[in-house]
Amino acid sequence: WQCTYVPHGINSDDFKPIDETDAKFVQFRDELSQGNEYSFIVYFNNRNIRRKNPGDVLLAFKTFTDKLPEEEREKCALVMHTHPVDDNGTDLPAVAEALMPDLNVIFSGAKLETDQMNYLYNIADITINIASNEGFGLGTAESVMAGTPIIVNVTGGMQDQCGFRYKGKILTAKDYEWVHSLHERKKWKDNDWGILEFTGDKGAVPAGKENKLMQKNFKICMAKFLAAVKELQ
């Protein structure tokens, strides 16, 4: 018997790159930003619980913006779609006020429709998930489908979302029929099948963001933010 187990799937009709001139999208974006124009937006979509490390995301954002000139710092924003205060997590507005009262932190705590969630991914320049023991990472998978790059831990299914190269070829969903799992170090270390290379540290380019990734300022911001996250680890 050949069994295949698919734990999660993302509907490409729901999460996808959209036209930034779409009237509903523009209205949603303007309401979220309250009329402010940001040049770089970091997006966090997770529960406010200890394992998801929302406080660390706030600290990483502060560490990142501390490295920027004031005029660039004012154009950066962190959007957190989560319950701002949760007994299982922390009081995020209080943390933000204590750590970075002068920075742009936007909380999105209301329940949203699927199309509105897709708007958030399209608004963002990057989506971050640094949760510990993350099994799959639905939010970052949705982000990639929407064409927005991700910053993640090398853990669980999130590393698969960044891509692996085997014998010079990026693995596809079809390849996993014989790969099964990439998370067994002994299986892939010093084997005769070829070298398995993790490509996430080089940066994947999801569909729809090619032009953005070619912009010098965007690439600089990505590098600085990733450095800030690593600095906290």
Model-derived features: where do they sit?
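Conserved donor-binding/catalytic core segment of Leloir-type glycosyltransferases
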Residues: 34-52, 58-61, 78
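Nucleotide-activated donor-binding/catalytic signature segment of Leloir-type glycosyltransferases, i.e.
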Residues: 89-115
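Short alpha-helical donor nucleotide-sugar binding micro-motif in glycosyltransferases
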Residues: 118-124
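Short hydrophobic beta-strand element within catalytic cores of glycosyltransferases
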Residues: 149-152, 169-174
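Glycosyltransferase donor-sugar binding loop
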Residues: 72-92, 110
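Aromatic "clamp/platform" in nucleotide-sugar-dependent glycosyltransferases that forms part
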Residues: 132
